[in-house]
Amino acid sequence: FFTFCQPGTRFVYTNPVYGGTHHLIHQILAPFGIEGVPIPAGDTKKLRETISKTKNLRMVFVETPANPTLVMSDICAAVEEAQRHAEHPLVAVDNTFMGPAFQHPLKLGADLSIYSATKYLSGYSDMTGGVILAKNPELIAELQGTRAKLGNILQPAECWILTSRLPMVNHRMNRQSKNAQRIAEALVGHPEIQAIYYPSLFTDPAQIRIRDRQCDFPGAIISLDLHGGKKAAFETLRGLEIFKNAVSLGAVESLACHPATATHSEMTPEGQM
């Protein structure tokens, strides 16, 4: 954002987003005069309309699937509308939830593909880092300049950990997706579950079309609504034996959390809805 957006400019973003991204948009970028314009994740018509009507637009930021609802947004639609826009905003995709094995934003026309390297790429919960990919070397050069000045540079040890894990990332992620699929299917019809959110179980035709066009696998993240709300959620977390109650994803251990009081705790109740 700091590389490609300046005070007085805007970016369109799909909502909801990861809690840390929400904090960045509202608590860090906004005071600098960089305005985020939210649109509901999965609403392709609204996405197109908002991009076409927004002035001083520098970026379209798409988090898909959304954290934690797993609602998918149409990357191709965002790219098409951005290319039509007179100001030619960049399209950036936070691909953390799908990772490099399940979804390929650059192949779909996005300018930037963003990852939390802490998750699938590292795979063992023993480092923190981030990765931004781009086809255009000029974009990479601009990002490198900002990174150097802001100090966002990984230490050599973390770089070694990350590069040593990459050869097995596809194998790890494919197994994780298969395991998640089995769990999601086993939970269908459970009397204590109100709703299951998992890409292979989508019933909305629009979501199915997006999934089939841009995802190779359903991924390894499952979200649930439980009868009984927050109380039931915490009782379930306390009762887990194999899953650990912690935030993160993509590592060898299985994790579960209550987003409203963890990753998205800074958001208002209305925002969490």
Language model regions located:
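Conserved C-terminal alpha-helix-loop-beta "cap" of PLP-dependent enzymes
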Residues: I193-M273
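Conserved PLP-enzyme active-site core in the AAT-like
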Residues: F1-E192, Y197
